[in-house]
Amino acid sequence: YHKIVLEDVMRAAKGVKDADQLFYQELSALLQPMTDAMYSLEAGMGHTPLFNDSGDNVARSMLSLLAALREEFSIAPVNKNAFPDAGYYCLRHQGLKILMDAGEIAPDYMPGHGHCDGLSFEVSVNQHPVFVNSGTGQYQGSLRGYFRSTRAHNTVVIEGEEQSECWGEHRVARRISQVSGDCGADWIHGEMVTATGRQQKRMILVDDQKVIVKDQVTGSAQGYLHLAPDYEYEEQ
């Protein structure tokens, strides 16, 4: 949706440029921060990160949007690691990139596209996805509930309960709260309280050639990790 809206703003700005310079300037001012967010979150991941109702093959590609931004508006992306308003945090180490969601499930006024992906993460190596969320395999129908569920994401189910109560296909009742996050050169930290009041904290660290994930929860927990296609795991 971010990329769809970014293209809409670009088209609107081009359309009003000759007729309304003030409106053109207002629209143009949105382009740089939107470009920075798109690039910072997606570059190095090898795909659109699969948080909430995200997916590939819906909006135009990041590369095509960057080309248009450069040609039409002379805009180049600025890489950032923290987006506290949206709750996304990035960690980069050589060819490794980790992206974690430490934000609210969705805007309060429109939570229907939100998933139970609090403190979930994705990992890519040399632009190849390794750990991914399950995405939006079905937008309507019997599988919609699974794709929005906690277990469909790289996070923790506490006491068998969902992080937030997803009603129907595009509704959310009680939801996560007290969500916060932060990041440094080799770590990402996030914490939150689930809909039923259980506290969850997560720290992701990069140590040499290892990615260490530390979880702290109130109650018993089951962790879920989803490998990208063509990858297998081995317990050691």
Question: How should these model regions be labeled?
Answer:
Residues 1-132, 182-187:
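Carbohydrate-active enzyme catalytic cores, enriched for enzymes
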